[in-house]
Amino acid sequence: MSDSKEPRVQQLGLLEEDPTTSGIRLFPRDFQFQQIHGHKSSTGCLGHGPLVLQLLSFTLLAGVLVAILVQVSKVPSSLSQEQSEQDTIYQNLTQLKAAVGELSEKSKLQEIYQELTQLKAAVGELPEKSKLQEIYQELTQLKAAVGELPEKSKLQEIYQELTQLKAAVGELPEKSKLQEIYQELTQLKAAVGELPEKSKLQEIYQELTQLKAAVGELPEKSKLQETYQELTQLKAAVGELPEKSKLQEIYQELTQLKAAVGELPEKSELQEIYQELTQLKAALGKLPDQSKQQQIYQELTDLKTAFERLCRHCPKDWTFFQGNCYFMSNSQRNWHNSVTACREVRAQLVVIKSAEEQNFLQLQTSRSNRFSWMGLSDLNQEGTWQWVDGSPLSPSFQRYWNSGEPNNSGNEDCAEFSGSGWNDNRCDIDNYWICKKPAVCFRDE
């Protein structure tokens, strides 16, 4: 501000310097001299002119000079006022800068702003007055319910019962006994884990159901029970035999014999088998321990021969395997007609339930070098293979497909035995087919 002020002062100095001389120049005579000197020829022509004209000129010039002096006298005061205003503004700016310096950093301000925003949103989400009243009422009801809790005597009774229960728990078997029980449970769990797969259990359950139905058709219930007891005792006696392989063979024959007994229609045949079992039991009781196994085996062989004279497992031209009968056709039909052909003989287009059954059927078809239909297709949903009985194809059976199959080449939706595995083929192609049904007793004609 000092630099800008000095030029104005210097300009004023030009106007104010040598006031004495300036005052001298303001005398009338000076003006008169100048006027006379400036208009020498005119004055001479006019004869010195009137005095009034000179006074008027002097007055006008004096007014102009006074006005200039007044304006010049105002300049220092305006400059001083401007300087004070600038100082005030500078001080205010300094104070504002200091105040700004004391504010929190930008990140802190943003954080505060965010918190305020969140708080505002939370306040907006507070339940309305009616909701608060509802909560208050629920709290009031809860308080009243607490007041209705059982009295002290009732609580003491509950505590005593808990104490007695704790004491009873303390009387449980000792740790060694618990460990023994735990081991037994572990063994039981392991045994359960070794049970056959679900499909096998279903097959066993179906066989038991069929056996139960056949037993229900026997003529005399008391005779059936007696026969069953005899078989149970015989099974126990067989369990004492030394050789496992021979035991398994005898047990299988007994199982087949039991099934056959359930299927015998005539009372005379049942009595005949019962008599043979009675004789077998009597012979078993009289045999010495060393020859008991051979004698039982011989009796069972004779009994099996007698039974086979009475009936056979499967109809003519059917093949028996593991409780089922299989028919391999000698003519060809498409898949749908093959399903119908099996139904006409009270059978089903073959549904495979086990690896043993698959190996048996694959061997039969490969020996005859025939492409044969099985009861498997994905007609209901592409890529989802299903047996004709409604059961899905087990993931463990996927390995039986030939390499690259099934490929659905040309809309192939039906499965066939092909070579050493399975193949998908068009359902309208003519193939041989295989029917399957449970084995029963068929009498010779």
Curated annotation (Swiss-Prot):
Xref: Pfam families: Lectin_C (PF00059)
Disulfides per UniProt: C311-C441, C314-C325, C342-C435, C414-C427
Membrane topology annotation: Single-pass type II membrane protein
Compartment(s): Membrane
Cytoplasmic face of the membrane: 1-49
Sequence repeats: from-to residues: 108-130, 131-151, 154-176, 177-199, 200-222, 223-245, 246-268, 269-291, 292-314
Superkingdom of origin: Eukaryota
Keywords assigned by UniProt, alphabetized: Adaptive immunity, Calcium, Disulfide bond, Endocytosis, Glycoprotein, Immunity, Innate immunity, Lectin, Mannose-binding, Membrane, Metal-binding, Receptor, Repeat, Signal-anchor, Transmembrane, Transmembrane helix
Residues the record marks as carrying a glycan: N92, N407
Motif Endocytosis signal positions after renumbering to this chain: 14-15
Residues holding Ca(2+): E405, N407, S409, E412, N423, D424
Cited InterPro entries: C-type_lectin-like (IPR001304), C-type_lectin-like/link_sf (IPR016186), C-type_lectin/snaclec_domain (IPR050111), C-type_lectin_CS (IPR018378), CD209-like_CTLD (IPR033989), CTDL_fold (IPR016187)
GO cellular component, one term: external side of plasma membrane
GO molecular function per UniProt: calcium-dependent protein binding; D-mannose binding; metal ion binding; pattern recognition receptor activity; virus receptor activity
Residues on Extracellular side: 71-445
Domain C-type lectin: 320-436
Main location: membrane
Stretches that traverse the bilayer: 50-70
Span list, region 9 X approximate tandem repeats: 108-315
Keyword Ribonucleoprotein tagged: no
Coiled coil ranges: none
Its job: Probable pathogen-recognition receptor involved in peripheral immune surveillance in liver. May mediate the endocytosis of pathogens which are subsequently degraded in lysosomal compartments. Probably recognizes in a calcium-dependent manner high mannose N-linked oligosaccharides in a variety of pathogen antigens. Is a receptor for ICAM3, probably by binding to mannose-like carbohydrates.
Subunit text: Homotetramer.
Domain notes: The tandem repeat domain, also called neck domain, mediates oligomerization.
Full protein name: C-type lectin domain family 4 member M
The organism of origin for this protein: Pan troglodytes (Chimpanzee)
Lineage: Eukaryota, Metazoa, Chordata, Craniata, Vertebrata
Gene that specifies this protein: CLEC4M
